[in-house]
């Protein structure tokens, strides 16, 4: 063969092949689904390119995929007359994985085969799945519009290398031949192959045909029998489509091995005409947080495939949604640039966003357990919503879930509607605290009075929470209030102070002034508080002051952070505060005040500028 060369696989491909053969073997029949799915994609791409260049059809516009096998040679062949590939494309698509972050992801995978098989499925392993059942795979392909002599041959045993060469191929498209391993004879059985295709590929809009051989007059006559419905699933009536068909179609378009959590299939007529089929996955893709992660919907215009990953139809905080939209209002020659500035696109985006939020609301209402699965996988992404989509903020807020003092669990199961339904008589605000961890939030001294009064506090410990709460200012007419900020509504919750206590506090005014003088501009203010029950002192910030958690976010992002000026609040009923107030020796007084401030700062920030000084001071006071 001309131009023959042997090349090594990209290292990630070798790792993926090894993991896949071992992890997916228990579900090995999916290789046929994957290869037929790829053939369908190749047909979609040809249809799209032929819109502007009909000559690409080369006189054969009836697109199909054909499956045949040879029992003597023990081969199974899947052939399509789709867009095909040239030599460079063969090397790019069959020798490398073009996903950033793949290497580190593969290295992190463990020995949990069930989990591994789900994660591997997210790569859209497609072609490589052939090696689950084959010890050698041969590919013959030619790109649509190329000369017959520009065909390409590719072959590999799925180990370290592959061979590529030039061949003559008269018909366009791709033909993949699997040389089956010993023990895989089931895939040479006509009935078995038919049943797999019916199970996994009935929804494919492309006709899938299987070879029929009949003996007539001593000769073998070959014909092709269509064995799938070959009608685009989303164009069919919802009442005719089974759940299994929706599930398999999801796996086809999302290249996922797991069933989706839920879906919504809608046909809209009137001002705008479109069909949408939207899915919520049951598992986050491994690269969801990767900057290069591709997301978006498949776009069809009048049932003609236009593009994958059309992100213009979904806001970023819903980037986990998979599915498609088939519009009658967009032009067939639409580009990503046209989509960006199109009124039709904006209207579709608005309608589809509402549809997804309604779908999630229904899931939360009908199946709390499934919704918890969704929340664990995608809750952090949904939390971007309040900042990104003010118009739908109330709908997004209903979908948020939090840990809370009511449940006494780190599980984020409490909705804002739950919280409001449990608010105490006269309670006007929704109280929350942000912290680095659930434990830090739960044990914060800021909660002491609220706990005593039985008032629920939402415990927020995800990094995004502080940023989200800057935009989420109210729900159901109730304002959100951080308990780490100075607020009169919290002070009002304290028990009425009797006259004797008032006199005692009045007597402490010189003490407060003495502390102010000592600390100077290191704090914004010093005051007595009734919001503490067990703790001697805390620090809080004013409503307009940057919070501790926000300062940490800025610092983690490498941005300059203005110094947070705290209000130093002292518990007049605490023995340590009383002892400090009674201390006459100035040096000793200073040590006590510094210790109380350091304790408060440590509880608030989790760190101290000089922890050794704090330890020295504490040890000294313990023995004094």
Swiss-Prot record:
Location in or out of the cell: Cytoplasm
Q: Which GO terms describe its molecular function?
A: ATP binding; ATP hydrolysis activity; ATP-dependent protein folding chaperone; unfolded protein binding
Q: Which UniProt keywords apply?
A: ATP-binding, Chaperone, Cytoplasm, Nucleotide-binding, Stress response
User: Alphabetically, which GO biological process terms does the record hold?
Assistant: DNA damage response; protein folding; response to heat
Chief localization: cytoplasm
Instruction: List the Gene3D superfamilies hit by this protein, alphabetically.
Output: 3.30.230.80, 3.40.50.11260, Heat shock protein 90, C-terminal domain, Histidine kinase-like ATPase, C-terminal domain
Q: What's known about how it's activated or inhibited?
A: UMPylation of the chaperone by YdiU negatively regulates its activity, facilitating Salmonella survival under ATP-limited conditions.
Q: Which SMART domains match?
A: HATPase_c (SM00387)
Give the span(s) annotated as C. Answer: 553-624
Post-translational modification remark: UMPylated on a histidine residue by YdiU under ATP-limited conditions.
Similarity section: Belongs to the heat shock protein 90 family.
Q: Give the record's subunit note.
A: Homodimer.
Stated name of the protein: Chaperone protein HtpG
Organism of this sequence: Salmonella typhimurium (strain LT2 / SGSC1412 / ATCC 700720)
Taxon lineage: Bacteria, Pseudomonadati, Pseudomonadota, Gammaproteobacteria, Enterobacterales
């Amino acid at each position: 063969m001309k131009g023959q060369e042997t090349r090594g696989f990209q290292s990630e491909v070798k790792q993926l092949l090894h993991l896949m053969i071992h992890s997916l073997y228990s579900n090995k029949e999916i290789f046929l689904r994957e290869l037929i799915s790829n053939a369908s994609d190749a047909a979609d791409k040809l249809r799209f390119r032929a819109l502007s260049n009909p000559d690409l059809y080369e006189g054969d516009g009836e697109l199909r995929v054909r499956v045949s096998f040879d029992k003597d040679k023990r081969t199974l062949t899947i052939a399509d007359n789709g867009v095909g590939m040239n030599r460079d494309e063969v090397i790019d698509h069959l020798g490398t994985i073009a996903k950033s972050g793949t290497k580190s992801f593969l290295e992190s995978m463990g020995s949990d085969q069930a989990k591994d098989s789900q994660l591997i499925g997210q790569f859209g392993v497609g072609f490589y799945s052939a090696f689950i059942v084959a010890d050698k795979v041969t590919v013959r392909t030619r790109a649509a519009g190329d000369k017959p002599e520009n065909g390409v041959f590719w072959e590999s045993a799925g180990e370290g290398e592959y061979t590529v060469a030039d061949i003559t191929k008269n018909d366009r498209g791709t033909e993949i031949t699997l040389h089956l391993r010993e023990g895989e004879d089931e895939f040479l059985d006509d009935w078995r192959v038919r049943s797999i295709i019916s199970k996994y590929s009935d929804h494919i809009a492309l006709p899938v045909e299987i070879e029929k051989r009949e003996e007539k007059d001593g000769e073998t006559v070959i014909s092709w029998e269509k064995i799938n419905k070959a009608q685009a699933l989303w164009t069919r009536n919802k009442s005719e489509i089974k759940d299994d068909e929706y599930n398999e179609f999801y796996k086809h378009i999302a290249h996922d091995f797991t069933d989706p959590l839920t879906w919504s299939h809608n046909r809209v007529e009137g001002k705008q005409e479109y069909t949408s089929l939207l899915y919520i996955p049951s598992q986050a893709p491994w690269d969801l947080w990767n900057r290069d992660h591709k997301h978006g919907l498949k776009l069809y215009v009048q049932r003609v495939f236009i593009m994958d990953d059309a992100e213009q139809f979904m806001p970023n905080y819903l980037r986990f949604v998979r599915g498609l939209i088939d519009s009658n209002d967009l032009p067939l020659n639409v580009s990503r640039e046209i989509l960006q500035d199109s009124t039709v696109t904006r209207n579709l985006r608005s309608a589809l966003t509402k549809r997804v939020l309604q779908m999630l609301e229904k899931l939360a209402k009908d199946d709390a357990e499934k919704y918890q699965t969704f929340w664990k996988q995608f809750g952090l992404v949904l939390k971007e919503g309040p900042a990104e989509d003010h118009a739908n903020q109330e709908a997004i807020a209903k979908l948020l879930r939090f840990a809370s003092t009511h449940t006494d669990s780190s599980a984020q199961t409490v909705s804002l509607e739950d919280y409001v339904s449990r608010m105490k008589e006269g309670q006007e605000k929704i109280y929350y605290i942000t912290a680095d961890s659930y434990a830090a939030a739960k044990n914060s001294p800021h909660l002491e009075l609220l706990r005593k009064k039985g008032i629920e506090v939402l415990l927020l410990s995800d990094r995004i929470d502080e940023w989200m709460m800057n935009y989420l200012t109210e729900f159901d007419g109730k304002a959100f209030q951080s308990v780490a900020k100075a607020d009169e509504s919290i002070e009002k919750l304290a028990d009425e102070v009797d006259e004797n206590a008032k006199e005692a506090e009045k007597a402490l005014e010189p003490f407060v002034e003495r502390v102010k003088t000592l600390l100077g501009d290191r704090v914004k203010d010093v005051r007595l508080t009734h919001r503490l029950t067990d703790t001697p002192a805390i620090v809080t910030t004013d409503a307009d002051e940057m919070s501790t958690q926000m300062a940490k976010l800025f610092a983690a992002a490498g941005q300059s952070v203005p110094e947070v000026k705290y209000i130093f609040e002292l518990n007049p009923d605490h023995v340590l505060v009383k002892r400090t107030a009674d201390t006459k020796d100035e040096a000793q007084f200073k040590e006590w005040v510094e210790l109380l401030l350091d304790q408060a700062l440590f509880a608030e920030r989790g760190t101290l500028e000089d922890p050794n000084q704090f330890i020295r001071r504490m040890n000294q006071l313990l023995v004094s």
